[in-house]
């Protein structure tokens, strides 16, 4: 069990695999002249500076990605290619730190448009005692929900939605859009839909992260392809932190079409690259 009283700086881990089934080699692919990894590393560095007492680390199983991360001036942890998820990769990377951290934020390596302030805010929520597991969500207005529905017709496993209790506790996550909405025409008179979308961002205490790495994958986790369901299937509480995100924010880069849309978003809305 980790001891928070003898911990090192908090850690932002960026898991980055080369062997994506839908978009092989994606950490090294470029969006508007910068690699996907470069964009996410810049987000991590800016967030660490905002949060304070925090370091950034890329966790990978690929020498090419490790070399590129070194060029970007970020620490690297080499992990086994046999690890079954980015969260387990983050856990193994945290253990390699000379002074393992008390808190870890897992910033997915395919999420190049998350504002650094959102990442820093999640770390700060963990420090305030938000719980053992926390994640960021944002409520969709109707145009955003319509865009998500259209996107899922092309890429049904892109984008994750969440059902929350009144106190912010996550009840469920799904690659389907939940909840189903009855009497939508009436609800559309309100500015916001009842759908919350999940960002590719998680925070854990070391105790929760170590438990996850040792636990077997859950049944619904495997069906949905969502790591966080391992916690819910085993009775853990996940706190959801509502955040504000830019209207043009995209979900993770999973397909060649996502890459093209990311290029288009930058062309239309400007480049959010920190720096």
Over which residues does each language-model region extend?
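Conserved alpha/beta core of the MobA/IspD/sugar-nucleotide pyrophosphorylase nucleotidyltransferase superfamily
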Residues: 173, 186-275
